[in-house]
């Protein structure tokens, strides 16, 4: 029987027990695709990343939820690169290329306030209209359609993974959501496997710009993601595209409703008519588990 060493890191926080936990497997080349899926299922984190050698980049990352493989995962990328830097396998002050199923993406490692920070350039933002029933979506989230923001549209967005961006009127609406994600596929008729990412301009922390929550597709094996890097990147791009935001940097908070307080920094730069979305976060080591497969 094979074993797998799974390191647990919590991303987008410097406090153990907060942020978004991810499993990190340093010896990803030792396992087949089926074995990686089994490891992710038994680890039970929203995502587990497997670090592998790459012929076209500095390294490859593959991401698995308990239910299926993902093209990209922001918090697991932060956790993986933080782990490699902490163990002396990568250096601060350098930019590395990582191969993912969303493409080859640059990742910068830097130090700020005495901590390692990871900056991931996400894929170019894309948007698609939501044509489903707003009342059914509200019902699936445990709120009413009156809780939706009147002036901003519900759309699907992606910087590597598709999610439904749902603007809300208030923090109170965010707090009272109790999702039934089994309803998502029939509500998200345009992209039935997408996740749902509601957000509001009202925040818990005064230094935050936006407050979000992230509810997973029922196919992923989880219900709520505590702090979501890729969806936060989509939120920043959404604010530029639909919110006419003049600012290029956003501090996005998430996880407060479930005791996993975390923050993601999103910065956008426009060049040649394209928007580049950069996501920055730190992480903290939690524990090591040995799983039999």
From Swiss-Prot:
- The catalytic site is made up of 47
Name the SUPFAM superfamilies on file.
Diaminopimelate epimerase-like
Q: Name one Pfam family in it.
A: PhzC-PhzF
Q: Which cysteines are joined by disulfide bonds?
A: none
Keywords, A to Z? Isomerase
Protein EC: 5.1.-.-
Gene Ontology MF term list: isomerase activity
GO CC annotations on file: cytoplasm
Gene Ontology BP, a term: biosynthetic process
Q: Which domain of life is it from?
A: Bacteria
Per the similarity annotation, which family is this? Belongs to the PhzF family.
This chain belongs to the protein called Uncharacterized isomerase YfhB
């Amino acid at each position: 029987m094979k074993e797998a060493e799974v390191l647990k890191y919590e991303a987008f926080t410097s406090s153990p027990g907060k942020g978004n936990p991810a499993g990190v497997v340093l010896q990803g080349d030792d396992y087949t695709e089926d074995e990686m899926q089994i490891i992710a299922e038994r680890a039970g984190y929203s995502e587990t990343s497997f670090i592998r050698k790459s012929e076209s980049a500095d390294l490859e990352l593959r991401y698995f939820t308990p239910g299926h493989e993902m093209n990209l995962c922001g918090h697991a990328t932060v956790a993986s690169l933080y782990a490699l830097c902490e163990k002396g396998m990568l250096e601060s002050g350098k930019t590395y290329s990582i191969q993912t199923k969303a493409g080859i993406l640059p990742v910068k490692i830097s130090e700020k306030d005495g901590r390692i920070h990871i900056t991931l350039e996400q894929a170019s933002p894309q948007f698609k209209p939501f044509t489903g029933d707003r009342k059914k979506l509200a019902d699936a989230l445990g709120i009413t359609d009156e809780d939706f923001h009147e002036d901003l549209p519900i759309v699907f967005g992606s910087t590597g993974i598709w999610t439904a961006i749902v603007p809300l009127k208030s923090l109170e609406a965010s707090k009272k959501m109790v999702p039934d994600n089994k309803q998502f596929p029939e509500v998200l008729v345009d992209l039935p496997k997408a996740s749902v990412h509601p957000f509001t301009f009202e925040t818990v922390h005064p230094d935050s710009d936006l407050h979000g929550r992230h509810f997973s597709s029922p196919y992923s094996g989880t219900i709520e993601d505590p702090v979501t890097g890729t969806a936060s990147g989509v939120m920043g791009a959404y604010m530029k595209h639909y919110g006419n935001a003049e600012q290029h940097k956003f501090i996005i908070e998430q996880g407060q409703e479930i005791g996993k307080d975390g923050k993601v920094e999103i910065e956008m730069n426009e060049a040649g008519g394209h928007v580049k979305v950069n996501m920055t976060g730190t992480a903290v080591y939690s524990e090591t588990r040995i799983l039999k497969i």
